[in-house]
Amino acid sequence: MPRSPAKTSPRKGSPRKGSPSRKASPKRGGKGAKRAGKGGRRRRVVKRRRRRRESYGIYIYKVLKQVHPDTGISSRAMSVMNSFVNDVFERIAGEASRLTSANRRSTVSSREIQTAVRLLLPGELAKHAVSEGTKAVTKYTTSR
């Protein structure tokens, strides 16, 4: 004989089977219970700051606008360019580091960077990169 649904479901306000009672317990005071400790101060909620993603995007965009002012770039193409710049940077930095340790020095100088660029980039591209780099270093030292 089936039971009626009213008898099987718990009554409103009664605790469920296996869960603690909702009545005032020593841990949790009732409505008028005052908490011990500092007089009613609220705990400040600390928001987690979003981690900043570093990229060469703004610089790639500036160069694009210098070369082709009327051309845009998609986010996928920007991602590819960013990966390319990171790759070239890592290659040059790694080679410059090896050159520095081979010369038994502890500081990477512009000379090691220049040699690394000459070793990594082919022919005419290396010459242009070295001349542009020298120009940039000269501009930086004169502005200081």
From Swiss-Prot:
A motif (SPKK motif 3) lies at residues 14-17. The keyword DNA-binding applies. Glycans are attached at residue 131. It is found in: Nucleus; Chromosome. A motif (SPKK motif 5) lies at residues 25-28. Monoubiquitination of Lys-139 gives a specific tag for epigenetic transcriptional activation and is also prerequisite for histone H3 'Lys-4' and 'Lys-79' methylation. Residues 1-51 are annotated as: Disordered. One of its GO terms (molecular function) is protein heterodimerization activity. A motif (SPKK motif 4) lies at residues 19-22. Keywords: Chromosome, DNA-binding, Glycoprotein, Isopeptide bond, Nucleosome core, Nucleus, Phosphoprotein, Ubl conjugation. A motif (SPKK motif 1) lies at residues 4-7. The nucleosome is a histone octamer containing two molecules each of H2A, H2B, H3 and H4 assembled in one H3-H4 heterotetramer and two H2A-H2B heterodimers. The octamer wraps approximately 147 bp of DNA. Contains 5 SPKK motifs which may interact with the minor groove of A/T-rich DNA sites. Phosphorylation of this motif may regulate DNA binding. This motif is reiterated in both termini of histone H1 and in the C-terminus of plant H2A, but its presence in the N-terminus seems to be unique to sea urchin histones H2B. Core component of nucleosome. Nucleosomes wrap and compact DNA into chromatin, limiting DNA accessibility to the cellular machineries which require DNA as a template. Histones thereby play a central role in transcription regulation, DNA repair, DNA replication and chromosomal stability. DNA accessibility is regulated via a complex set of post-translational modifications of histones, also called histone code, and nucleosome remodeling. Belongs to the histone H2B family. This is Histone H2B.2, sperm. It comes from Parechinus angulosus (Angulate sea urchin). The lineage of its organism: Eukaryota, Metazoa, Echinodermata, Eleutherozoa, Echinozoa.
